[in-house]
Amino acid sequence: MSRFFRRRKFCRFTAEGVKQIDYKDLETLKAYISETGKIVPSRITGTKAKYQRQLATAVKRARYLALLPYTDSHE
């Protein structure tokens, strides 16, 4: 018996019926990036493998076009 209620992971893209993840949709992409700028793994977010691959490609494209940072701001 666990002490804490763990929320069930689910794929947000499957639930919403998304066909393709857009690299220009920065609000969606920022939800899957840590504060240090790394892509959060699917075992933590619950994203299916198909959408995790699309997500990684979209984040890399957005980084290349300077829409997202590669790392956090070093202060």
Curated annotation (Swiss-Prot):
InterPro entries: Ribosomal_bS18 (IPR001648), Ribosomal_bS18_CS (IPR018275), Ribosomal_bS18_sf (IPR036870). Keywords: Ribonucleoprotein, Ribosomal protein, RNA-binding, rRNA-binding. One of its GO terms (cellular component) is cytosolic small ribosomal subunit. The keyword Lipid biosynthesis does not apply. GO terms for biological process: translation. PROSITE patterns: RIBOSOMAL_S18. Signal peptide: none annotated. Pfam families: Ribosomal_S18 (PF01084). GO terms for molecular function: small ribosomal subunit rRNA binding; structural constituent of ribosome. NCBIfam families: S18. Part of the 30S ribosomal subunit. Forms a tight heterodimer with protein bS6. Belongs to the bacterial ribosomal protein bS18 family. Binds as a heterodimer with protein bS6 to the central domain of the 16S rRNA, where it helps stabilize the platform of the 30S subunit. This is Small ribosomal subunit protein bS18. It comes from Teredinibacter turnerae (strain ATCC 39867 / T7901).
